[in-house]
């Protein structure tokens, strides 16, 4: 059996980041973690384009348009949806997750779900680099590996 694994090198990769303005104090940390991970793994900042959208519900449409351009090896979606007292959380979080997944499957371009879905602001901050690592950086690493694996499959 042949085992195929991808590298975590971003030297030849071009990524799009889509992040939300909503909950920007949290999301800005995710973006910083994403950029740091990309550069630490050999990516060049000029190969990382950053697009800002109002909120998580707008992320899938912009991600899909970016994926359809063919200019990007992967799209990384970053945001934070924090539960409140209404059902709004369920609709926004579920819509964003489904839209991002459908974008990846429809376009064949890897699209990362780096949208935090938490009960509290504290939980979101922890996942944005305070205590529990940085989910923005983790999303970029997953996309580096996936994009490189797809390149191997396409050879």
Curated annotation (Swiss-Prot):
The UniProt annotation places 5-amino-6-(D-ribitylamino)uracil binding at 22, 56-58, 80-82, 113
Has the keyword Transferase been applied to this entry? yes
Where does the UniProt annotation place the signal sequence?
none
**Residue numbers binding (2S)-2-hydroxy-3-oxobutyl phosphate:** 85-86, 127
Q: Name one GO molecular function term.
A: 6,7-dimethyl-8-ribityllumazine synthase activity
The GO annotation for biological process reads:
riboflavin biosynthetic process
Matching entries from HAMAP family are given as: Lumazine_synth
Spell out the family assignment given in the record's similarity comment.
Answer: Belongs to the DMRL synthase family.
- The name on file for this protein is 6,7-dimethyl-8-ribityllumazine synthase
Species: Deinococcus radiodurans (strain ATCC 13939 / DSM 20539 / JCM 16871 / CCUG 27074 / LMG 4051 / NBRC 15346 / NCIMB 9279 / VKM B-1422 / R1)
């Amino acid at each position: 059996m042949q085992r195929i694994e991808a590298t975590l090198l971003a030297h030849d990769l071009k990524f799009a980041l889509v992040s939300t303005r909503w909950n920007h104090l949290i999301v800005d940390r995710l973006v910083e973690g994403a950029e740091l991970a990309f550069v630490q793994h050999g990516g060049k900042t000029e190969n990382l384009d950053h697009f800002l959208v109002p909120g998580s519900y707008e992320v899938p449409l912009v991600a899909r348009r970016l994926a359809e351009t063919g200019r990007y090896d992967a799209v990384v979606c970053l945001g934070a949806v924090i539960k409140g007292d209404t059902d709004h959380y369920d609709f926004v979080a579920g819509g964003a997750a489904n839209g991002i997944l459908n974008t990846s499957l429809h376009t064949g371009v890897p699209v990362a779900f780096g949208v935090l879905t938490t009960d509290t602001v504290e939980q979101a901050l922890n996942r944005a680099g305070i205590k529990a690592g940085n989910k923005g950086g983790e999303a970029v690493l997953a996309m580096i590996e996936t994009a490189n694996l797809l390149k191997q499959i396409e050879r």
